[in-house]
Amino acid sequence: MTTRIAIVGAAGRMGRMLIEAVGEADGAELVAAVDRPGSDFVGADAGELAGIGRLGLAVGDDLEAALAAADVLIDFTLPEATGGVLQACRTTGTALVIGTTGLGEAQLAALDAAAGEIPLVFAPNYSTGVNLTLKLAELAARALGDSVDIEIIEAHHRHKVDAPSGTALALGQRVADTLGRDLKQCAVYGREGRTGERDRQTIGFETIRAGDIVGEHTVLYAGAGERIEITHRASNRMTFAAGAVRAAQWVAGREPGRYDMQDVLGL
């Protein structure tokens, strides 16, 4: 059975990757590519925009019209667009995959409300490798407990606008949940000046923004005489796009609810 997929944010870096990824996936069909009204790319051929040759599908700017033909929408846009995307999918009953990061509490609450009506997948990262890293981070935290200091270091390209990354926060949340800690209370974001001795109950976050780094995440568990580092490095954004398409094929036709990539992968 073919899954009919629409993409919003089609002219963006990830949008173009998604167009290519849908074309490469078995059992998936791109039925709509949408960009913001007024975009210079509206009317362009989606395939030519993605660099894969002409598809005969023009980029549009009417999201609800695009959803009428789709089983599922993939959204990699900006947090301020999330509310409109959720409302459009609720109106049309369309399943949704959200890859947008940097969502605030109000946007997350709106996402949960939408999950009462439509099936949606929300994940900070759609890479299979990153989601395995989340599982490994949980296993390490469970085994090591409070005997180690835990730091999360992430690096991305200079154009990324949110920090720490959604993936770094997800890693921190997974570790905190495993250890029975409240991440809001124990997270330390960067250090400067005379900080005093480190509190072992804290989870540290360090952020690097430089060059064209696609994405790197390390969870460091440092104890007496040894340390463990769990690291994932992405060398190409196509891994994220392919994972999002996999999630779209998985969520189409599911019961309403909020799912994540761990559900998609059966982890």
From Swiss-Prot:
Keyword terms, alphabetized: Amino-acid biosynthesis, Cytoplasm, Diaminopimelate biosynthesis, Lysine biosynthesis, NAD, NADP, Oxidoreductase
Keyword Nuclease part of the UniProt annotation: no
Binding site for NADP(+): 36
Amino acids binding (S)-2,3,4,5-tetrahydrodipicolinate: 157, 166-167
Protein name, as recorded: 4-hydroxy-tetrahydrodipicolinate reductase
PROSITE patterns according to UniProt: DAPB
Naturally occurring in which organism (per UniProt): Alkalilimnicola ehrlichii (strain ATCC BAA-1101 / DSM 17681 / MLHE-1)
Physiological role: Catalyzes the conversion of 4-hydroxy-tetrahydrodipicolinate (HTPA) to tetrahydrodipicolinate.
Organism superkingdom: Bacteria
Molecular functions (GO terms): 4-hydroxy-tetrahydrodipicolinate reductase; NAD binding; NADP binding; oxidoreductase activity, acting on CH or CH2 groups, NAD or NADP as acceptor
Localization terms from the record: Cytoplasm
Keyword Amino-acid biosynthesis: yes
A Gene Ontology biological process term: lysine biosynthetic process via diaminopimelate
Pathway(s) this gene product operates in, as recorded in its UniProt entry: Amino-acid biosynthesis; L-lysine biosynthesis via DAP pathway; (S)-tetrahydrodipicolinate from L-aspartate: step 4/4
Major site of localization recorded for this protein: cytoplasm
Residues annotated for NAD(+) binding in this entry: 9-14, 35, 99-101, 123-126
Protein family according to the UniProt entry: Belongs to the DapB family.
Active site (catalytic residues): 156 (proton donor/acceptor), 160 (proton donor)
GO cellular component entries: cytosol
Record field: catalytic activity: (S)-2,3,4,5-tetrahydrodipicolinate + NAD(+) + H2O = (2S,4S)-4-hydroxy-2,3,4,5-tetrahydrodipicolinate + NADH + H(+); (S)-2,3,4,5-tetrahydrodipicolinate + NADP(+) + H2O = (2S,4S)-4-hydroxy-2,3,4,5-tetrahydrodipicolinate + NADPH + H(+)
EC number, UniProt record: 1.17.1.8
